[in-house]
């Protein structure tokens, strides 16, 4: 053990912590492209940037495929950036003059919104305008990541996972919390 040099981030003698921080690389797989390296999950989406929106528990990402919005794998075996299969998992964050956020699909140009079918309330991406049913607010989730909250009258409703095989995006009931999403910035 005498030949091992240890680089320390603290001093045993003074108890002082250095002014620098070293963070490990989150994804050390050299086969993954650089845009797969996420922005820290604590970073909220902002206008003008493009994101992959991922459920950190399942690893599934919000995807538009064949006109249907849902969750799909986002790993290298089933690459979510391959536009040849008709899928789009890149969402451009926009902001209107009243500061409401919207998420526009990079492939279709359609926004995430809701269908207003309150018996079976789902999210969809079928309109090319950023109107009230496509207005979102993002709030930090206590478990990390961020909740996507849609405007509903004078309040908010959260986005949850549900439906068939837990691959659909459903509107939460009044007062119910939502998923903690990670926003992974896509670098061009």
Where are these regions (language model features)?
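Lectin-like carbohydrate-binding module/patch detector with strong preference for beta-trefoil
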Residues: 2-188
């Amino acid at each position: 053990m005498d030949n091992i040099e240890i680089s320390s981030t603290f001093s045993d003698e003074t108890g002082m912590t250095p002014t620098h921080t070293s963070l490990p690389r989150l994804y050390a797989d050299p086969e993954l492209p650089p845009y797969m390296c996420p922005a820290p999950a604590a970073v909220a989406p902002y206008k003008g940037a493009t994101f992959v929106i991922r459920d950190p528990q399942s690893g599934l990402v919000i995807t538009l495929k064949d006109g249907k919005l849902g969750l799909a794998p986002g790993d290298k075996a089933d690459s979510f950036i391959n536009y040849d299969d008709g899928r789009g998992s890149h969402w451009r964050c926009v902001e209107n003059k009243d500061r409401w956020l919207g998420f526009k699909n990079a492939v279709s140009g359609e926004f995430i919104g809701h269908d207003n079918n309150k018996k079976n309330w789902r999210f969809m991406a079928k309109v090319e305008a950023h109107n009230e049913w496509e207005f979102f607010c993002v709030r930090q989730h206590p478990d990390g990541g961020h909740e996507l909250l849609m405007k509903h009258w004078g309040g908010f409703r959260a986005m949850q996972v549900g439906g068939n095989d837990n691959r659909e995006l459903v509107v939460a009931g009044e007062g119910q919390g939502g998923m903690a999403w990670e926003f992974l910035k896509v670098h061009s």
